[in-house]
Amino acid sequence: MGLWYDETLDDHTRLGLRVKETLFSGRSSYQHIEVIDTVGFGRVLIVDKVFMTSEYDEFLYHEMLAQPALSTAPNIARVLVIGGGDGGTVREVLRHSDVKDCVMVEIDEMVVDVSKEYLHGIGTAWNDPRLDLRFIDGHEYVKRSNDEKYDVILIDGTDPVGPGAVLFDESFYAGCKRMLTPEGVMALQSESPLLMMDLFVETQHRLRRLFSEVHPYLGPVPLYGTGIWSWTWCSDTGEPLRAIRERQEAIVEGSKAYNEELHQAVFALPNYVKRALKL
């Protein structure tokens, strides 16, 4: 049967991928990083034994994290990406010509180096002159920033363990809100509403204490075990369904998943999520 790589999702569930070859395995100052080439998902980035992204389905995650916010914010000249060392989120940001400055804050330089070396199809915007890449802890960056303002903030964090755990703190979200322009939009990955429902609900509560408009939305990401994933759109103004058509039209042709119809559909929540959130 060959070699398989398993990620343990909980005490009762594992996801396994059949491996063709291990391309990289090493430890940074923060975490263990691997890249494997698989039969079904192509090249896969793994951090501390957790699947992060794959060539096969990364677009489902990165497009849905970035494009709903970028299509609804009144202005997108300045964008902050926190995390996202594989390069997929900044790729999506820099598809927009209206973006003049994209700051990416990543704690682990090795993740970026490994992604540049082995995940060429995901991180295609590393050489864009609008990208300002800074290697610093995202929580510390937000805490220290006094007067920097952004039109859009995208939080592309890992699961709430290891160095990514602080990206789920309410104090971190409050700091991000302080850095937003008055009409700014923040979007973040907010875990699975199946396997991690308690964390999903608590994240929504934390965000609701800070923002007037908090709207979770759902989509499929097969690599993440449960098959369904969530992101959350946040702002003090605006409405997530009121997209700027011209901005959408400019990027839809080059998108694998995102389009005008999908934008409307993903914000429709199933009953079990509505009940959990008491909507």
Named regions from a protein language model:
Residues 1-34, 205, 226-279:
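SAM/dcSAM-binding transferase cores
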